């Protein structure tokens, strides 16, 4: 499931109803954050739905019960990414305004709890500072999918010409210029 909000809402139902392994993006992101965090102070940014679900909190606490968690919903980030402005002065301003409550906290790790947010990695990292490691839940999930496929003998190591299908919730024209 390539969406944090959808993972939080339906992962267990999908696992129960499908005969195949179903990966969500929350558990891999949480595991990576625990692995890299030295202070066990971890921040989570995501959509309102993801943050409200507390799915990351549950995942982190199930791995390390003494982790300290700070969560922040960032409702302006998805429209910012979908507008194509992710590396502009506007993006830097919105990132700074939005993440101000997390700045200068004791966290050393920040989970990007939305698959749109990796496009904002640069302004987020610059604002939060070099002492904060930024974790992309999508990247971590791709790593886990690769391991699962390899373990099952299903990982394709050949490089045939791939076929891509893209879906977007935003402007098709904007997406086409990006993709």
Model regions and ranges:
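Non-catalytic structural scaffold of enzyme domains
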Residues: 1-179
């Amino acid at each position: 499931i390539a969406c944090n909000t959808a993972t939080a809402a339906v992962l267990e139902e999908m696992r129960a109803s499908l005969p195949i392994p179903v990966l969500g993006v929350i558990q891999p992101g949480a595991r990576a954050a625990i692995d890299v965090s030295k202070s066990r102070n971890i921040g989570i940014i995501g959509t309102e739905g993801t943050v409200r679900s507390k799915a990351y909190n549950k995942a982190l606490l199930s791995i390390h019960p003494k982790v300290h968690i700070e969560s922040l919903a960032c409702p302006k980030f998805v429209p910012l990414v979908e507008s194509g402005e992710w590396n502009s002065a506007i993006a830097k301003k919105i990132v700074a305004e939005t993440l101000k409550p997390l700045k200068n906290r004791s966290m050393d790790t920040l989970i990007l709890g939305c698959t749109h947010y990796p496009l904002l990695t640069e302004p987020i990292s610059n604002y939060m500072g070099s002492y904060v490691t930024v974790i992309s839940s999508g990247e971590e999930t791709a790593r886990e999918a690769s391991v699962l496929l390899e373990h099952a003998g299903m990982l394709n190591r050949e490089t045939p010409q791939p076929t891509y299908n893209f879906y977007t919730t935003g402007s098709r024209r904007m997406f086409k210029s990006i993709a």
